[in-house]
Amino acid sequence: TVRIEPLIEEIVERYERGLADLPFSLIKHYGDDFASSGHLMLARIEGASQEFRNAFINEMGEEGVACNVHYKPLPLLTAYKDLGFDIADFPNALAQFSNEVTLPLHTKLSDDDVDYVIAMCHDVFARLSAKGVR
């Protein structure tokens, strides 16, 4: 039987090392008194706008790397808007959402796959920055 946790932990550590030189704030998966299930690799691109985040996701997709945005703030959902919720009342939720990207994280990723994702993060970040997208 293959245990999933060590595989995910290896991938998370590989991402942490490989993305350390980018202005990405990665969610902490492991600490002295906690461990996550490792089902998402959430990264905040520090200082990035939604425009940059969206362009990053699109360009990563063009490079064959599926990225996403998770955890849309509830006030942005129609049901909550209809109840009178206003995203302006939740600035922290909006800030988290605005520059958050979810990178691939699953047990079928090989070391080469993770290295490719890391390399594309560097390349796409550099390309967008060179174009002046922020």
Task: Enumerate the language-model features and the residues they cover.
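PLP-dependent aminotransferase class I/II
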Residues: 1-134
